[in-house]
Regions:
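Core SAM-dependent methyltransferase catalytic element
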Residues: 192-207
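Conserved beta-strand signature within the Rossmann-like core of class I S-adenosyl-L-methionine
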Residues: 138-145
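A short glycine-rich, Lys/Arg-flanked "PGG" loop and its adjoining helix->strand segment in the class I
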Residues: 125-137
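Class I SAM-dependent methyltransferase SAM/SAH-binding core
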Residues: 50-99
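Short alpha-helix
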Residues: 164-180
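A conserved beta-strand element that flanks and buttresses the S-adenosyl-L-methionine
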Residues: 111
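Short, glycine-/aromatic-enriched active-site segment of Class I SAM-dependent methyltransferases
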Residues: 146-163
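Conserved class I S-adenosyl-L-methionine
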Residues: 1-45, 149
Length: 207
């Protein structure tokens, strides 16, 4: 059974998936494309890429699916349905990725675009360890972490109750290294959303 906090996230994105897609159209200075391009430049065509928290078929997932064998995972059934329609060439799985079990060395890259801020703190450490195991030696992790010291918050966002948590940047960096990754890039980036400034820590690391 999913953690009650991650189930809150599933229910939230079931309820406000289309609202969220429209909301993110208002981003100014969004770094996703630049970081994704960096990841793509390090992969061969046809590489196996796992997209954690893929949502309803984001532009990032769509671009990855143009060159790679993409498996998207999302906890929201409605978002997964939307993704399957939007990007039929990719494979999508509805699951709580904090509980996901996959064979070792299954992917050349794992990407997670501004999703780990929904992961309860105590679940992030084992998740990073499993991600390392899912990657082939030399595989890549691209992720954006929440960049604030947030033990856990549940409340309304975009019209639905959801959950957020996170560590400060220095802790995120340490946890990535402790999961036996070598960090290639590590930057805190601020961009504008319709709600105001957003601050996330972007990390590109090699297994």
């Amino acid at each position: 059974m999913p953690d009650p906090r991650t189930q809150i996230v599933a229910d939230a994105y079931d309820a406000m998936g289309e609202t969220f897609a429209a909301w993110r159209e208002g981003f100014v200075g969004d770094p996703r494309r630049e970081w994704e391009d960096d990841l793509v430049s390090r992969l061969e065509d046809g590489a196996r890429v796992l997209d954690l928290g893929c949502g309803g078929g984001s532009p990032e997932t769509r671009r990855l699916a143009q060159r790679f064998a993409v498996t998207g995972v999302d906890i929201s059934p409605r978002q997964v349905e939307r993704a399957r329609v939007a990007i039929p060439e990719a494979e999508f799985v509805c699951a709580d990725f904090t509980e996901l079990e996959l064979p070792r060395s299954s992917f050349e890259a794992v990407a997670s675009f501004v999703v780990f801020n929904h992961v309860p703190r105590e679940l992030l450490v084992p998740l990073l360890g499993r991600i390392h195991g899912w990657l082939v030696p030399g595989g890549w992790l691209l992720s954006a972490f929440g960049a604030s010291d947030n033990p856990g918050w549940t409340g309304e966002w975009l019209g639905a109750e959801t959950f957020f948590a996170g560590f400060p940047p220095e802790v995120n960096s340490r946890l990535v290294r402790e999961a036996e990754f070598t960090i290639e890039r590590d930057e805190v980036v601020v961009y504008e959303s319709p709600d105001g400034p957003e601050r996330f820590q972007w990390v590109l690391a090699q297994a």
